[in-house]
């Protein structure tokens, strides 16, 4: 594929890493793209791998982003060229702060988690009051008079009033994250590429470093998910103890 000569007994190309058949023939490699053989993260990327985005080469960004690089690199390029200053990340909108941890934006993830906790704690008692009022209303439908049903429904409406603004705040927070996610991720990736390139000028060493420090982390996302509920319940317990 890359044109390099290999030992007939080699199982893979010593230059690009492509698998070799027993006869030494080099089968078609779908990841081969514009001279960047052996880089699967460039698959689907239509931008020149040697071109730059804010001073970082596209091929290096692909190695650092890894998962879904074909989706993010065009967004990064458009933002860098001022073709599309405003973008929206639906995954970040629905799944933050866990998306932030998944993409190794752990500092932003911690900040967003703190904001969500600040909203969730006072919201808990309001939701509990709304749940209690709704349960009473549901029971009244089958067991009480029309007057009692009307009174129970009014209690539900009253309990819902303080919940709506807090839900609105949560929606605003998620919307903000949706808008800042792609620019934040681009800045993080470009900074990481430049830092790793300075430390590892050799391509092989750089690629090995990005496998460790780039990409995504399901473990970090899961840890963030568990950590959120541990901190939430701990703070809720402390608040209840202070009230008592």
For each predicted feature, which ranges?
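Cys/His-rich metal-coordination motifs, chiefly Zn-binding "fingers/knuckles"
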Residues: 1-32
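Helix-coil boundary and N-terminal low-complexity module in membrane systems
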Residues: 3-5, 30, 41-43, 85, ...
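Glycine-rich, often proline-containing surface loops adjacent to acidic residues and nearby aromatics
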Residues: 12, 91-95, 163, 168
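Transmembrane helix recognition focused on a "late"/terminal membrane span
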Residues: 27-76, 81, 116-244
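Hydrophobic alpha-helical membrane segments of integral membrane proteins
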Residues: 109-114
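Membrane interfacial helix-start motif at the N-side
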Residues: 71-108
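Internal amphipathic alpha-helical segments of the cytochrome P450 catalytic fold
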Residues: 10-13, 107-108, 182, 186
């Amino acid at each position: 594929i890359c044109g390099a000569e290999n030992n007939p007994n080699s199982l893979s190309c010593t230059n690009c890493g492509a698998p070799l058949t027993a006869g030494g023939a080099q089968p078609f490699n779908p990841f081969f793209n514009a001279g960047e053989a052996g880089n699967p993260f460039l698959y689907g990327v239509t931008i020149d791998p040697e071109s730059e985005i804010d001073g970082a080469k596209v091929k290096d960004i692909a190695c650092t982003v890894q998962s879904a690089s074909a989706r993010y690199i065009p967004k990064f390029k458009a933002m860098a060229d001022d073709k599309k200053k405003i973008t929206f990340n639906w995954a970040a909108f629905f799944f933050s702060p866990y998306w932030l941890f998944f993409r190794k934006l752990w500092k932003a993830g911690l900040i967003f988690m703190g904001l969500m906790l600040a909203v969730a704690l006072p919201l808990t008692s309001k939701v509990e009051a709304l749940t209690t009022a709704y349960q009473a209303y549901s029971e009244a439908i089958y067991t009480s008079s029309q007057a009692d049903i009307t009174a129970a429904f009014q209690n539900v409406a009253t309990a819902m009033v303080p919940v709506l603004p807090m839900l609105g705040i949560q929606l605003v927070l998620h919307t903000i994250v949706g808008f800042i996610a792609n620019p934040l991720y681009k800045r993080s990736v470009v900074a990481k590429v430049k830092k790793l390139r300075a430390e590892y000028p050799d391509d092989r060493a750089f690629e090995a470093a990005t496998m460790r420090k780039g990409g995504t982390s399901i473990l970090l996302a899961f840890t963030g998910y568990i950590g959120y509920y541990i901190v939430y319940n701990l703070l809720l317990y402390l608040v209840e103890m202070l009230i008592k």
